[in-house]
Each structure stands twice: as structure tokens, then as C-alpha cells.
């Protein structure tokens, strides 16, 4: 059995980006480890969700542990950096934020966290962090540096994977969602889709820093058998994701269409014309 480490930026990223893969690997008997760079202090909490004097970072720490339990994660660890906020947020300049961290120093922290693990695969984001988030980009840099150092030290077996979004598949899902919205409106039904969320995603899809085209993606992991656990893990993040959110309100069949496959890249093995692999551990 393998040890697969998922390195994420904030609590909830693990559930949204890779929760299905984590649950599937755990069910198959592999050791799944989650490392989180920050505690998500700069997130925007759902109104009224925090208790008196409850710090958002503390709440999100508890939420990621709950999510990890649902997904079958064997261990959760934090690097100890502060959330950097979104692009151009003033929090980007905070001296303790992950974005400001020296990459070598952060790599040493990651190495300390993983010193007791025999890592077979490390999962980070693609080179632009999925959608350009500073902390996601930094995860890519630090995780890549860690793997490079391991290889230089003689570990030829450790593998790197990028979790990403399939730009083409997401466009198809959005087109289908819009068709369903129009149908529901035409017959007077209440549509589950969130117009604002769809518009945000459409704007992001127009950017070259959002996900990757299907032709560059080497792994498409079918997670339909564990989608219930993925959705429960998402639901654990109550400070960030309300019950009426896009992620939780959609019918099961729509959720399966949108999230039934999770996408990865093996940066050492360009896809070319090869079919996508359904096994994250295979080169």
C-alpha cells in the first residue's frame, strides 16, 4: 500500500479539489495524509455562523479535521503559516502569511512534517494554483521543491501530481447547468443553480490561469463511488459553505456530472495522445 500526501492551502480545499480521490484511496487501503499550509484566517465566514469570540482560524481547523475523518485521512498536519487572502488583498503583505514565506524555509517545514512518512506521491496544485490564488501557487512551489530535493537525495520513487480543474469538462458542465436553468424557468420550476456562482465561474474559465485544457491532463480519477463522502466533507466546512450553496444544493445527478471525476497531471509524463489514467499511483 502507498502513502499519498495531499498538500493544500486552506481548510476546505481538500474536500472541494480532491476529496473524492482521498476517500477512494483510503477505501483501497492506502495511507492518506493531509498537510494544510494555513488555517484559512482570511476566509469570509457565513453570516452568523461563528460563536461569540470564536476565531475563524480555530473554526476552520476543527472543520478540516471533521472533513478529514469523513474522507478516511490518517493524519492532518499544518505548516503554520497565515492565510494570505485572495489576489491583491492587503493580507498578501502580512509578514507571517504563506505568500511571503521563503520557499526554502517553507520546504524545510514541509520536510519536518513529512519526516516520519514514507511518501510515494505528493499532490500539489498546478503551476498557477488552479485559479491564481497566491497560497495555491505557493503550495505548488514548495511541494515541487520538496520533491526535487527528495529526488536529488536519491529517492527515485517519490512522484509528484498536480490537482487541477479540467477547463473543457467544466465548460460542458456549466453549459448543461444553464440549459437546465432555462428549462426550469420555462416551466415555472425553481432552479437549483446559482446565477452569481455560474457567472463567476464563467469569468474564470475565460482566463488562461483557470485549470488546464483536457489535452494536458494525464489522470481523470472516477470518484462517483465515493461522492456521498465528498459531499459530506464539503458540508463539514460550515463556516465557508452554506447549505444553500452551489455545491450542496444541486441534485445528486448534477453533482455527479460536475464532481464525479477529479483531475490531475503527472508533470514528468506529458499526456501526448495517451488516454487519461484512472489510477493516481501509476506513472
Named regions from a protein language model:
Residues 1-118, 144-153, 265, 273:
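Active-site rim/loop-helix segments in enzyme catalytic domains that contact anionic ligands
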Residues 1-3, 92, 100-283:
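Metal-dependent de-N-acetylase/amidase catalytic core
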Amino acid at each position: 500500500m502507498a502513502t499519498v500526501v495531499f498538500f493544500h492551502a486552506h481548510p476546505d480545499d481538500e474536500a472541494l479539489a480532491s476529496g473524492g480521490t482521498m476517500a477512494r484511496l483510503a477505501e483501497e487501503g492506502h495511507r492518506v495524509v493531509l498537510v494544510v499550509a494555513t488555517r484559512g484566517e482570511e476566509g469570509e465566514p457565513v453570516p452568523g455562523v461563528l460563536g461569540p469570540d470564536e476565531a475563524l482560524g480555530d473554526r476552520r481547523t476543527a472543520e478540516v479535521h471533521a472533513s478529514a475523518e469523513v474522507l478516511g485521512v490518517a493524519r492532518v498536519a499544518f505548516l503554520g503559516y497565515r492565510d494570505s487572502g485572495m489576489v491583491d488583498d492587503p493580507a498578501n503583505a502580512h509578514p507571517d502569511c504563506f505568500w511571503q514565506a521563503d520557499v526554502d524555509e517553507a520546504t524545510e517545514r514541509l520536510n519536518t512534517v513529512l519526516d516520519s512518512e514514507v511518501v510515494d506521491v505528493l499532490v500539489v496544485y498546478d503551476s498557477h494554483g488552479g485559479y491564481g490564488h497566491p497560497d495555491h501557487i505557493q503550495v505548488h512551489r514548495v511541494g515541487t521543491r520538496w520533491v526535487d530535493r527528495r529526488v536529488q537525495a536519491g529517492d527515485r520513487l517519490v512522484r509528484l501530481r498536480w490537482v487541477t480543474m479540467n477547463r473543457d469538462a467544466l465548460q460542458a458542465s456549466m453549459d448543461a447547468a444553464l440549459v437546465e436553468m432555462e428549462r426550469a424557468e420555462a416551466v415555472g420550476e425553481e432552479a437549483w443553480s446559482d446565477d452569481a456562482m455560474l457567472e463567476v465561474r464563467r469569468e474564470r474559465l475565460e482566463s488562461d490561469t483557470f485549470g488546464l485544457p483536457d489535452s494536458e491532463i494525464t489522470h481523470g480519477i472516477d470518484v462517483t463511488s465515493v461522492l456521498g463522502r465528498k459531499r459530506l466533507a464539503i458540508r463539514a466546512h460550515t463556516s465557508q459553505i452554506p447549505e444553500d450553496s452551489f455545491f450542496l444544493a444541486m441534485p445528486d445527478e448534477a453533482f455527479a456530472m460536475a464532481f464525479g471525476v477529479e483531475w490531475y497531471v503527472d508533470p514528468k509524463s506529458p499526456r501526448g495522445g495517451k488516454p487519461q489514467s484512472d489510477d493516481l499511483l501509476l506513472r
